[in-house]
Amino acid sequence: MKRVAVLLGGISEEREVSLASGRQVAAALRKAGYDVFEIEVGADLGAVIAALTPAPDAVFNALHGRFGEDGTIQGVLDYMGIPYTHSGVRASSMAMDKGAAKAVFAAAGLPLAQHRIVPLDELAEADPLPRPYVIKPVNEGSSVGVFILREGDNRRADIARAWRHGSVAMTEEYVPGRELTVSVLEDRALAVTEIRAEGFYDYTAKYAAGASRHEIPADVPPSVSARARDVAVAAHRALGCRGATRSDFRYDDETDRLVLLEVNTQPGMTPTSLLPEQAAHCGIDFPALCAWMVENAACRV
């Protein structure tokens, strides 16, 4: 019986999401027959290292946000020689840095929206892109700190002054249409889901039960579904990801335009999360999904 440590919590703004993910994962792994213990991660890295000594057979990394999915904890685990789920240091750090990720995607010829990384003083003075456009942190997930600026919206300077996500912001063309997402397990795209939310698909819509509706499979033409799955796998490979990822898209029906927004190297594992839903749609129940992720990690050693 493998001994598995589940890392959950963390010190990012996505701590509560990680706690929910980690608890669900731990319960599923116990159901699948693993010897599981949970490590609630806080600011004391030494305590985490101590809790991982002696080393478990594998770590299920259920952390989200900075320090949990940006290559930091991955580097610690590599140093300790402990296999872990999801992507390694390089892929995790690149995916978390939206500017670096988009450079990789552009080099791979993947479809992107127009975008610019701008200093906050420049953002306060003028629009960096034609409106409507999106303002988002360079290195946060779960739609933390995301705003849409439309014609007539006078919040730009206020947003720049109140910004607490570093000295620059990612600005990106707002693509009208539908929100699509595709989960990938190594080289297999699972399904295409359309996310329907009232208004913007923000942090609350992502994680509050009933705040958004998931249509799986998405009601899009077969050619669009195939395109989204192909791009998701290509993005996973371009970043050098391992295990599970989830790629998010916008699709404009009127122009048949599909654009890749980002790749999530630590997809949510909460009751409303998309990866478990897509896996279930493909016949993989939640304990089996979690077990696959552990075995995928363990076999890399």
UniProtKB/Swiss-Prot annotation:
SUPFAM superfamilies on file: Glutathione synthetase ATP-binding domain-like (SSF56059), PreATP-grasp domain (SSF52440)
Biological or metabolic pathway of the protein: Cell wall biogenesis; peptidoglycan biosynthesis
Positions of Mg(2+) 2 binding: E262, N264
Entry-linked PROSITE patterns: ATP_GRASP (PS50975), DALA_DALA_LIGASE_1 (PS00843), DALA_DALA_LIGASE_2 (PS00844)
Cofactor (UniProt): Mg(2+); Mn(2+)
Start and end residues of each ATP-grasp domain: 102-295
Location of this chain's protein in the cell: Cytoplasm
Residues binding ATP, per UniProt: 128-181
Recorded GO MF terms: ATP binding; D-alanine-D-alanine ligase activity; metal ion binding
GO cellular component terms given for this protein: cytoplasm
Amino acids binding Mg(2+) 1: D248, E262
Catalysed reactions, as listed in the record: 2 D-alanine + ATP = D-alanyl-D-alanine + ADP + phosphate + H(+)
The record's free-text note on cofactor binding: Binds 2 magnesium or manganese ions per subunit.
Gene Ontology BP terms: cell wall organization; peptidoglycan biosynthetic process; regulation of cell shape
NCBIfam families listed in its UniProt record: D_ala_D_alaTIGR, PRK01372.1
Family: Belongs to the D-alanine--D-alanine ligase family.
Name recorded for this polypeptide: D-alanine--D-alanine ligase
